[in-house]
Amino acid sequence: PCMTVGNIRDPKVAEDILARGDADFIGMGRGLIADPEWVNKVEFGNECDIRKCISCNIGCAGHRIGLNQPIRCTVNPAVNTGEDYMKQKVNKPCNVVVIGGGTAGLEAACTAAEVGCTTFLIEKKAELGGLASVISRIPDKKRLADFPNYMIHRARKLHNLFIFTNTGATAELVKSLNPDIIVNATGSVPTLPPITGLHDLVDKDGTNVATVLKMIERLNEYPKD
């Protein structure tokens, strides 16, 4: 028998390998760290619920092999505990307001909703996903989109998670939601080096000085080659 491995993330790719007779078995390591239920989800036709590995190698190879520390996972914060947290339902009404619809905000909102909290997610932009969705526009980083896409899909399925997009988290709005807990997940901004005058030029119209985020917004303006 022949087994093949190597970041086989898509169930269709795995099935095609087996159907062609290129291998008898598919071996999977990082994919099962990201989602231990990968195989079960494929078997029962729930591929859209798979939390795919993004091949960052930070928590698995980086921690376990490089640093001899316990395995962690960028996309699966429950890698060492499983979904036991879902059994710990809140025993009284609890309103949670999460500000920021990036991957951290989505994870916080989904987790709160899954344990029974009435949860409100507020995102100032039109789309959820935050920096992960932005960075995934870089050609060599496209697979990063799998993570925010999975998180958005997970969030949309929760009946007690209410999502506001194109909405600023004003004090009035947050107060009107009667929060018991407020989570600040507004993300980060690129670090700039201490160069005199840089702040006056960066990301300004008419200059060629840009942060990586502004550069990504202008990808279509650059030559394809």
Region locations from a protein language model:
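Local beta-strand N-terminus motif with an aromatic residue
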Residues: 23, 94, 161, 179-180
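Beta1-alpha1 glycine-rich phosphate/pyrophosphate-binding loop at the start
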Residues: 98-162, 166, 191
